[in-house]
């Protein structure tokens, strides 16, 4: 990902059907095409036959555990454990997991991978579906990662150099400046001091017991989801999940971690330059309480947010295409800070000789919209474009990729994003889009583009910023 600060607002896709005129208080339940449920130990599963792409199966083990769960002596160990999962389990010691998968034509990197973030660790497999036995074996591998990683001392010591080299890569200017933004965005929260890459001194010196302590406390079935999407038999997959995960036990002494992100009164500002920076960036983030769409009626405000972002994007695109554009590009979106807060993000790539002008133009445009709102013409155009997009997604629903679906189910597990299906979502758009009026959108703008919870951060090259300061 080029920048954490670039957020593209995507219309999410799934597959469920409800009749027209859905009552606003209707709870949006999961798509009936998904075999969805929980084992008695709390493990969640999502199983979904899907034929696009053909003859492929996608697997995920999603764990609600990341760097924010680390103790002060474990900084970086959530990510380190992710590496260790590929270094041997009770049934597949040493490199046998990778050897087994690669012998079946599955490549490490594109089809075998994992990632760790602040609040989650995700293990991913993608396989051809022509060997039904391989599906069961991949579910077994997920089960091994969930509870039976060996964590041999020699393997830990061998892996230190690999992870420390990743840490070194994260010391480049782009990461230093990104961390400055995150420090301001996560100010006064646990996230501000829990970067997933960790602290090098801890990576160099931690003991096996510290790593085992993290694994045993946070890798529990009530914090896990298993997802299998693709060319599969759902009943067989469910049976295999039950076989490999039902015996897993929870930790009765697991702690509750404060994962809140404060929404400050007023505006937080920051400027940071770096002699190794290669570009200049301005970010405006506005934090608001976490917003969900659990009920059908919630979709109306959700659609208003989409229209707002799309119309703001059009405004900034017009500035970019002007005769003397004040910046090179701008990205606008709406996203979540985990399950703690939601936020609007404007990210602007600034010209070397126009940092001050670019920031001023961006802030002035936000102020103009806040004061005067949008026009009826802008709203009608945005509504027509959004409806056209949703119609296209609905018409092409049989070509919804398994990768897209599994990403959506991951968001459902981590953020409670509803997964009712594209049929239901299409009905909701058709139901609510015609009802949304300009006054409603502009009222949303007035309430949303406020100074509380606002974070303004500019980063880049010293020579481009000159004497620009936060006060100026």
Stretches with model-predicted labels:
Residues 94, 98-102, 150-168, 179, ...:
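Acidic/histidine-enriched alpha-helical segments
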